[in-house]
Amino acid sequence: NDCIDSGWVSSAGNYVNKFEESIAKYTGAKHAIAMVNGTASIHLALKIAGVQSGHEVIAPTLTFIAPINAISYLGAVPVFMDSDPFFNLDIEKTIDFLKNKVEYKNGQNINKETGNIIKAIIPVHIFGTTINLIELVSICKDRGIAVIEDASESLGSFIGPNHTHSGT
């Protein structure tokens, strides 16, 4: 009640700092930054990853609209990947796509069908379930594709011993 009683309910201040520290500690992350919403968080992460107009970003077919809006805000194009039986991004199909439909050339990942650069992927841990990202993250790291986890629906969920998080 102290936060409400103090009259200091805002996007800044001591309670926001305490919240960020608590989330970082709880998830085992080095840092946590409170954002106004998931769309803003993904938008910022895509900008940091260097996504620009004309680039492509892989996203699941089943998701909240936030990742797709964030991609569109930058003038980039979503490349939709099918969902697995748990409604998450189908990792096997996504890896197959990266290996067979994307050419790695001069440090860029070129979609063979469109000729556009694939810059990032947004796996979404939907309905509290998690995606095993180990192999996908390894492939993306080797190719320089940013992996931006949307863990908005999975706070408190784990992949093995690790919490899901944004900021893979």
What are the language-model segments listed below?
Residues 63-68:
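Conserved coil-to-alpha-helix start sites within the AMP-binding
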Residues 60, 77-86:
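Short beta-strand->loop structural element characteristic of the AMP-binding/adenylate-forming
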Residues 34, 59, 120-123:
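A short beta-strand submotif of the Rossmann-like class I SAM-dependent methyltransferase core
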Residues 9-56, 70-73, 80, 105-113:
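Phosphate-binding glycine-rich loop
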Residues 1-9:
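N-terminal "arm"/small-domain region of PLP-dependent enzymes with the aminotransferase-like
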Residues 55, 61-62, 82, 151, ...:
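Nucleotide-sugar donor-binding loop of glycosyltransferases
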Residues 86-168:
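Active-site phosphate-binding strand-loop segment of PLP-dependent enzymes
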